[in-house]
């Protein structure tokens, strides 16, 4: 048999060995896509902190459509604006667990190290419960907690409804009492509230204020106007666009 008949397979075998050796040195396998199994590089942090929006009782994510649209106009992306609906009949402690998952998810998705939480009405209770009871002491992942017409000290209008979340909003309920015990602005976040003397849902209207927070009285706005009013929006935006903890 001619020598060439042996030489060709030998050359092919040598080429295969060289290919396998090169793959081994590079860390890639012929059975997997190049780069598979390598550490995924997280995205760089955005120029501002992402925002989580928490609506109130008998409401939904539709609460925030106007404000979310304004934040987009001012340079925020869809990924940085987390607006979701939840079952408002459940305990605010249960909703706080949902908030915890949403916060961790948006931080992972955006590469950010901190998040701002903007709430309306009852949403203030679950957000504050999350910071106080579900975050480790000294944890800094939440930069700011913003309450618009928050039920921070309860409201007498909550005597008109019966779900557990609503009973938790009643003045001097065990939920509100424990949440406000010792320190109303718990932990490391910046706290800010906006309240209106014309709020027909929060009564007394000053119930929305927090000791230790920056409390801003608005113009004569109704409860649902607090998240629609442009002046309130600009004030909230100017607060959350700050990055005091760095990026």
Feature-to-residue mapping (PLM):
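Bacterial N-terminal signal peptides that target proteins for export
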Residues: 1-15
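C-terminal motif of bacterial Sec signal peptides marking the signal peptidase cleavage site
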Residues: 22-24
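Residue-level signal for mature regions of secreted extracellular proteins and peptides
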Residues: 18-19
């Amino acid at each position: 048999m001619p020598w060439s008949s042996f030489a060709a397979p030998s050359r092919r075998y040598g080429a295969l060995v060289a290919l396998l050796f090169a793959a081994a040195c590079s860390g890639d396998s012929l059975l997997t896509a190049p780069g598979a199994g390598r550490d995924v590089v997280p995205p760089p942090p955005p120029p501002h902190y992402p925002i989580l929006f928490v609506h109130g009782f008998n409401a939904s994510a539709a609460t925030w459509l106007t404000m979310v649209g304004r934040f987009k106009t001012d340079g925020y992306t869809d990924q940085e604006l987390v607006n979701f609906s939840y079952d408002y009949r459940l305990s605010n402690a249960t909703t706080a667990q949902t908030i915890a998952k949403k916060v961790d998810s948006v931080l992972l998705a955006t590469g950010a190290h901190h998040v701002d939480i903007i709430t309306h009405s009852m949403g203030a209770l679950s957000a504050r419960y999350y910071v106080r009871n579900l975050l480790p002491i000294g944890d800094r992942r939440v930069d700011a907690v913003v309450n618009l017409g928050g039920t921070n000290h309860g409201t007498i209008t909550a005597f008109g409804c019966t779900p557990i979340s609503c009973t938790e909003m009643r003045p001097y309920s065990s939920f509100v009492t424990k949440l406000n015990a010792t320190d109303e602005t718990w932990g490391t976040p910046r706290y800010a509230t906006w309240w209106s003397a014309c709020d027909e849902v929060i009564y007394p209207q000053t119930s929305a204020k927090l000791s230790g927070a920056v409390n801003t009285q608005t113009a004569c706005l109704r409860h649902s106007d607090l998240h629609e009013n442009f002046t309130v929006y600009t004030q909230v935006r100017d607060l959350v666009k700050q990055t005091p903890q760095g990026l």
